[in-house]
Amino acid sequence: MYFDQSELLPADILVGRNEAPDASKARGIRSVLGSWSNHNALIVRSAEHGGYAVGDTTPPRAMVVSLHHYEDLVNAGTYKVRIYRVRDLSMDERLRISLKWYELSYGRHYSDYTLLQLALFRFVNHLPFRLPIRGTWCSENTVRPFTAILPDDRNPIRKPDPPFLLKKNVTPRTYANRLECGILEDVTERTNRNDK
C-alpha cells in the first residue's frame, strides 16, 4: 500500500488500527471504546517530507512522521489505515488547519491515560467539560487545530444537530461517530493505493 499524494488533502484525518502481536494497549482501546480504530493523526503539509506527512501524537511527544512510516506498517501487515475527510472545507481552511497543527499540537506531551479513563470517556461522553488528564492523546491533538480555525458549527467533533455542541473528551470512537452521521467522509479508496 502507498498513499496517493495527488488524492490527499491537508487536514485529512488518518484513522489507524494497530494489529501488531504486541499491541495489547491498542486492542484494549478498541475494545473499551467499541471502535474499529485506536489511533488518529492529521495529514499535514511538510516541505521536509516532500509534500505531505503525518502530524502524529504518540509517546512521548507529538511529532511529524513521513507517510512512508505508515506505509511500512501497513505493508508489514501490522497496521490498517483509513483516511477520513472533513466535508466542505476550502483549501485555504485546510492549509490553515495544517499549519495550526504545528503551532498548537507539535511537541505536546502524550497523555499517560489508562484504559479505565477511556472507558469513563465512553460512558460519560456527554460531559460539558474536559476530564482532567495530564498531557494530550492522539484524537484530541488531531482535532485541536480544527477547533482553533473553524466555528463550532463546522468543527468535525461537533454534535450533528443544533446547537452543535463540541465533544469535550475526544476519542477514536468520536471520529467513527462523525463518519456515521456524515460530518466526515471516508476517502480511503481514493488515497490508499495497492497498484505500485
Where are these regions (language model features)?
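Short, surface-exposed secondary-structure edge patches
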Residues: 2-7, 32
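Loop/turn positions that initiate beta-strands
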Residues: 10-12
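Residue-level preference for non-acidic, small/hydrophobic
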Residues: 41, 102-103, 142
